[in-house]
């Protein structure tokens, strides 16, 4: 990202940066809203959005279709049924200073043409750091609860919402026939601390903060887990209502309280900007005495008719704004830098600090982000902290941004020890000793150990047995964790080959699996049968199961079609030599063949070559291949195929086969499949519940057929 002033950007630079910002913000939206695993602080995220908005303001002709200024939240998880919001759940614009708040009020006055003498009432309430939820009531009964999702479609979490005591199942008093109540699900600080203690005692993962704990608890597939987590709910607004039941925001809140909802008692109405700024400062001072996390104050125009007149701008209402609290800072001594290995192999540096207190919380660790952040120079050569690097022994400035993730933001150069030396980031994984590499254009260094890295092992095994890989029934998350942590050699599963030797090892063991709680003779027999049924597997599924970075289902199918046998693929991966810019060498023939496959390219090719260059991975694969056989890919017969070279999209529910099977079959017959519909799509196969894709197809003039017509189309070609 160009750090220079926006006014100095050329059109080309602005266009490139807007493209980068769109992708980067979308990535962080997914991490925060869907995965509950943010990588950056709220302040850093807000800075990205501000930068995007400022560039768009200066170059309006460059505003992209996928601009973050038009989008809310992130795509929803596939774990839950989709739920369409009757009215969009919008996000709020942010204010970061008193000047921003004055400007917000002035914009409203200008838009409404209000004279200075007319009082404009504003409500103010703490901005809860939790998970937004929409509750739909019909005839006074809760019928649906949905997360924000992308603002239009959320996740249906009704069963879990019913377990939250603050959410009434039946409304009280005189209420509209239909009412959607919006609010925030959160976890109190004391309950959060108790939950993490319980998780530690059970040997389970702990949560980084109350917001992640609340989001993770609400998104459980087992509502009994949600019920045990002590979630709470503050109502703060309404979506769709069948009749008007209040004239002001404050009256609405009072009514919601009468209906049985919990309303934040700190919500107040003010008549001047000076008063709401005073309220902001008061709450900021008191925030750590509250039993829940807040990251600012939300201001709303009190008059609901004025709210309606003001309307919305893109992704947010004109009549509301979030005044964010600044991040708090303190100085600490950097005692050490630890390198942690994440589930995907990412090496993440963590600062170990002398204990300090920020905002009432003792901080001993802080984020250092990545290798470049420590060096003080970005991967594109741009300076970070004006080029100052971070060293062990430095006095560093710690920021607890967004009340969530402490991070090192700068150093006090005057206090640096004279004999200090620059930190050398490891190029070997501290968990397994494999090479840790950086892809071109990425700031993260990743372990290539893959199948043998203990830091990644459980997730790798889970991926290996997943539905679209080996699809071994009876090896779910709990079972994989049990076998991985088993102390007995006859029970442990640390590598994929261990799955297929389990039955043989058990035959010689005194500790029998069927005698262990949670298993039994019947279930163990079913598990062995499920394992043995996968000793032969299609090549594409095998390649996907290996978990090579960037080799998802689509690329695995492309590679299988290109090489047709595992031996040919492995030989190509072993022989491929990547280009070397330093020596001015081009890639060899095997490299060119690999990277010229449609959709593969240098990035995917590099990941494949790195994977096979690790001796550990080759050793694990050799043992695995003694137990299983990847089946040769049958060549595509396109000459007589009625769908060869066509772009096909599947939507809705199919009765004769799953959508994944239908996609695989279409590709075997020479078609290209896509998850999204465009004007280039040739055919939409629509089952029941097709939804928006069906409407789009009609708009674009795309041919639409049902499943029966699809079956007739491919009859006789099913290879």
From Swiss-Prot:
Gene of this entry: ligA
Positions annotated as active site in the UniProt record: 127
Occurrences of domain BRCT (ranges): 638-719
CDD domains xrefs: BRCT_DNA_ligase_like, LIGANc
Superkingdom, taxonomy of origin: Bacteria
One term of GO molecular function: DNA binding
Class of this enzyme: ligase
Binding locations of Zn(2+): 429, 432, 447, 453
Cofactor(s) of this protein: Mg(2+); Mn(2+)
Matches recorded under SUPFAM superfamilies: BRCT domain, DNA ligase/mRNA capping enzyme, catalytic domain, Nucleic acid-binding proteins, RuvA domain 2-like
Family according to the record: Belongs to the NAD-dependent DNA ligase family. LigA subfamily.
Protein name per UniProt: DNA ligase
Record bears the keyword rRNA-binding: no
Protein species of origin: Bartonella tribocorum (strain CIP 105476 / IBS 506)
GO CC terms: cytosol
Lineage, uppermost ranks: Bacteria, Pseudomonadati, Pseudomonadota, Alphaproteobacteria, Hyphomicrobiales
Function noted in UniProt: DNA ligase that catalyzes the formation of phosphodiester linkages between 5'-phosphoryl and 3'-hydroxyl groups in double-stranded DNA using NAD as a coenzyme and as the energy source for the reaction. It is essential for DNA replication and repair of damaged DNA.
